Amino acid sequence: QGGFMAMDVNTGRVLAMQGGFSFQHSSFNRATQARRQPGSSFKPFVYAAALDSGYSPATIVVDAPIEINTPQGVWRPQNASNQFYGPTPLRTGIEQSRNLMTIRLAQEVGMDIVAGYAERFGVYDRMSQVLSTALGSDETTLYQMVASYAMFANGGERVEPTLVDRVQDRYGQTIFRHDQRTCVDCDVALAAGEAPRITSNRERVMNEVTAFQLTSMMQGVVQRGTARSAINLPVPIAGKTGTTNDAKDVWFVGFSSNIVAGCYIGFDTPRTLGRGASGGGICGPVFNSFMSEAIQTYGGGAFRAPEDCQFISIDRFTGARLPDGVQGENVVTECFREGEEPIFGITFDGGFAMGSDVPLFRGGADETIKTIQKSDGTTATVGGQASAGALGSGGLY
């Protein structure tokens, strides 16, 4: 069984909803009623909290083993590949759905902050503040997930799904309207092809630069990450896959500039969907099929960049700033807040901007002391680089 839902990211209008394979077989609406673990499709909310807490898409976080003491014993989370990748830019963490980087981010930012984001967006009414929930172990509905992703797509403004746009009385007077934004010139005759100006008065739930940074990172999921083989559409698409433990539920939630849609598939009584089942492989094609048709009616375009964005070329493998105008497969143009542009080098979680002459890994005891430049422009003297197995200070873990 499964569920599907699509909505307009600006008005909240629900464009499509499917609650199961057959209403005759079951009238249970899995889009609105089934509470399931979202798995990795929850991770963008952890990254949103990190981006608003001083991280950038180029910040380096160490992907390495981690152990958490719990009342049930020691918890040792793993990446899906059962491998570790060392120092990695934040962008890659979400593109490749790295569990260990996400746990480390949640630990650094604080689960109270992450839970606050999830509750503000409406993913949960009350989220458990334990680290495992950063990987999507709390239950929610597809309806709530799609509505929450809509706020990424529209630049961070609150929007609620609706099945009713407006209600009129028998005289044609509007007595209820869902969209409360102000239309500046709706009563004025406009030239053909000219749209009225709509002024937003909605609550802002996320900084618009953060929303754009996150959207750009989630475009990478589709372009070269866990959804790359499933999504092939003529307009820019951002999204996130989700696969729970033992592939009992699989998800994909994604959006264009004007439509957000999500899919989850799983058994009503949870059991594995089979070896190799994944959100990208099962739900990705469902999303792609729907959006292929929807785009023909609703179109789509580039995601709007905020005026406060400062675009800088970054090496997507190392997170290092590159000279303007460089090109190549390793180059990605990142948005930075004004005044927070990175210096040349690699910005580590923990505050250091390490020049290209300082390797990420080096065998440790005999290394000479080095002077490095911190992210605020000042310098600091540090000892030799630790080995890969010993790297563990400065907030990296």
Which residue stretches match the model-derived regions?
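Soluble, non-transmembrane domains of envelope/secretory-pathway proteins that act on or interact
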Residues: 59, 65, 69, 75, ...
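Active-site-proximal alpha-helical segments within enzyme catalytic domains
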Residues: 9-14, 44-52, 138-163, 209-218, ...
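A conserved catalytic-loop motif detector
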Residues: 72, 76, 138-236, 241, ...
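Active-site-adjacent helix/loop patches that line small-molecule binding or acyl-intermediate pockets
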Residues: 61-66, 70, 78-154, 162
